[in-house]
């Protein structure tokens, strides 16, 4: 057989067509595939990708469903919950759509800024969302961060926490959520760019810019500072959702000065910070206000979604104590139930706990420490005694350190 005839015998190993029947025949080790079969394979793969996108999008909770889940754990803050639900849904929808072959429109990432007083639920909102979506979650405190080369934590260490939360599964970590608290503490020390180095303020903002937008970062696997002889973990932050939280103490003055709240001028009533409704005032915040506060323009541009949280009042704190799925009252009742003891909180006691949290300016975050101090002596005593039927926490036991909750013995209740 001539070489020409041998060439004519070459055929696609999949469809059986000869070389002269197709535009191109691609050769592999003892196998051939034609351009038509390549196109067909590509179509099949794309169909499968579209199916997985549909499955992913179907399993992703809709904004209303996310809101319902948040309602189980977070009391109040309706506007913030709605804004978060929409932003998070759009973020993960964007990730799944990237699997598609469509390149016509690129949806940009929308990081989120939660602006609200201490103890208003910023951290809890972020944690609950991560748990709902079953994605890795990492928390960091902006106050510990410094610019690379200075004493403190590098921003890459935040990414290491996320990788650790994903059990070092990089692909999983790249779809995670990072919450950075106290972001207001890295504000520039003055509104104007400084000649001297601001390593814990503007320097940190500059260092965070790349990972907020999306970059392939080199992360030291053991944490700490980078050195040239160590191996690095590479993580792409393009699809990592960053939620930033801060109390932004003093921002209300900037908003008022701009005229965002009509409390200035002749005849205006001067209100103290406690009298001001910070939640409503913060709703009027503009990028220029954050700029004056000390957040650099590039940083503001990378956090397009802004959600404000309200200051929690006495009634809201009482609800937080009792209503969420993991409410503090339910937790302490469960703890005593394990010792076969019933626990009751009088309404006056709950209100007294809420008042103490407001006085301490700790919001919901301070509730646990107050309840813990009230219950300490009782919880020390109860496990050692088998004749206790019930414990009643009264208003007096909350307000007076020398008064403990009432202990009801089993024989006392029977005689009553």
Curated annotation (Swiss-Prot):
What SUPFAM superfamilies does this protein map onto? Glucocorticoid receptor-like (DNA-binding domain), P-loop containing nucleoside triphosphate hydrolases
Q: One GO CC annotation, please?
A: HslUV protease complex
A Pfam cross-reference name: zf-C4_ClpX
Give the keywords, sorted.
Answer: ATP-binding, Chaperone, Metal-binding, Nucleotide-binding, Zinc
GO MF annotation terms: ATP binding; ATP hydrolysis activity; ATP-dependent protein folding chaperone; protein dimerization activity; unfolded protein binding; zinc ion binding
Q: Residues in domain ClpX-type ZB?
A: 1-53
BP terms from Gene Ontology: cell division; proteolysis involved in protein catabolic process
- Residues annotated as signal peptide: none
What InterPro entries does its record include?
AAA+_ATPase (IPR003593), ATP-dep_Clp_protease_ClpX (IPR050052), ATPase_AAA_core (IPR003959), Clp_ATPase_C (IPR019489), Clp_protease_ATP-bd_su_ClpX (IPR004487), ClpX_bact (IPR046425), P-loop_NTPase (IPR027417), Znf_CppX_C4 (IPR010603)
Homology family: Belongs to the ClpX chaperone family.
Q: What's the stated role of this polypeptide?
A: ATP-dependent specificity component of the Clp protease. It directs the protease to specific substrates. Can perform chaperone functions in the absence of ClpP.
Its name, as the record gives it, is ATP-dependent Clp protease ATP-binding subunit ClpX
Native source organism of the sequence: Clostridioides difficile (strain 630) (Peptoclostridium difficile)
